[in-house]
Swiss-Prot record:
Source organism phylogeny: Eukaryota, Metazoa, Chordata, Craniata, Vertebrata
Molecular-function annotations in GO: actin filament binding
Function, in words: F-actin-capping proteins bind in a Ca(2+)-independent manner to the fast growing ends of actin filaments (barbed end) thereby blocking the exchange of subunits at these ends. Unlike other capping proteins (such as gelsolin and severin), these proteins do not sever actin filaments.
Keyword presence, Acetylation: yes
Quaternary structure and interacting proteins, as annotated: Component of the F-actin capping complex, composed of a heterodimer of an alpha and a beta subunit. Component of the WASH complex, composed of F-actin-capping protein subunit alpha (CAPZA1, CAPZA2 or CAPZA3), F-actin-capping protein subunit beta (CAPZB), WASHC1, WASHC2, WASHC3, WASHC4 and WASHC5. Interacts with RCSD1/CAPZIP.
Keyword annotations: Acetylation, Actin capping, Actin-binding, Phosphoprotein
Source organism, top-level taxon: Eukaryota
PANTHER family: F-ACTIN-CAPPING PROTEIN SUBUNIT ALPHA (PTHR10653), F-ACTIN-CAPPING PROTEIN SUBUNIT ALPHA-2 (PTHR10653:SF2)
Protein name: F-actin-capping protein subunit alpha-2
Amino acid sequence: MADLEEQLSDEEKVRIAAKFIIHAPPGEFNEVFNDVRLLLNNDNLLREGAAHAFAQYNLDQFTPVKIEGYEDQVLITEHGDLGNGKFLDPKNRICFKFDHLRKEATDPRPYEAENAIESWRTSVETALRAYVKEHYPNGVCTVYGKKIDGQQTIIACIESHQFQAKNFWNGRWRSEWKFTITPSTTQVVGILKIQVHYYEDGNVQLVSHKDIQDSLTVSNEVQTAREFIKIVEAAENEYQTAISENYQTMSDTTFKALRRQLPVTRTKIDWNKILSYKIGKEMQNA
C-alpha cells in the first residue's frame, strides 16, 4: 500500500478523492469527506484540489439552504449559479454567497433577474409550492425564469429528502421541469431522480431516473401554471407508484428465487443433533 501511495501523484490522489465525494450518497457528504480526508492526509491539497467536487455535489443534489432573514429555503442548482460562488434566490430577488463545504449562505443582496418573464415565473412558483406542500412534507422547490437561446424559459426544481442515519438509511428525491413560453402549445421536459442508500448489515443503493416529455397548452399565466402542475403530478405519481410496485414484485419473486429453501441434500439440519453429522464431527476435531 505504501508503494502504491508513492506511485500516485498529488493530481491522481485528488482525482480519486473527488470521485468519492461526488458520488457520496445523499446525507452522507460529511462522512465521505472525513474518510477521504484521513486517506489523503493533506487538508490543503484536498480543499484546493477537490473544491470543484464539493460544488458539483451540491449542484447535482439540489442542496437546500436557508438564508438568514428569509423564511423559505432555496435550492443550489446550476440554474441559479451566478459564478464566483454566488447563487440566485429568484423568489426573494436576491443573490448570496454559498460555501460548498460548510453548506452555508451569506451576504444576501438585492438582485434583479429577467423581469420580462417574472409574472410567468411567479404563477408557476405559486402553483408548484402548493403542490410540493401537499405531496412532499419536507420538500423544497425553486422556480427560475430565464432566457435560453432567445426563448423565455421556465425551470422548476423540486427536492425532498429523508436522512435516517440512526436507522441506517438516507434518501433523496429530485425532479427538474422545463418549458418555454410559446404561443398555443409547448413541450414540457422533465427528469425525475431517486437515490436511496441502505447500509444496515449490508450496503445497498437505489439510483433511478426517468425522462418525461409532454405537451402543455399555453394560455394565460395562471391557467398555464395549473396545467403544468397537472403534468408534474401525474408523471411523479406514476413514477413513484411504478418504483413501489417493482420492488414489491422483486420481493415476491426475484429475491425469493435467490434463496435456497432447503440445502443441497433436500433435508433440514436438526441443530440439536449437529454432532451426529459429518460436519459436526469435523468441527469437533478441528
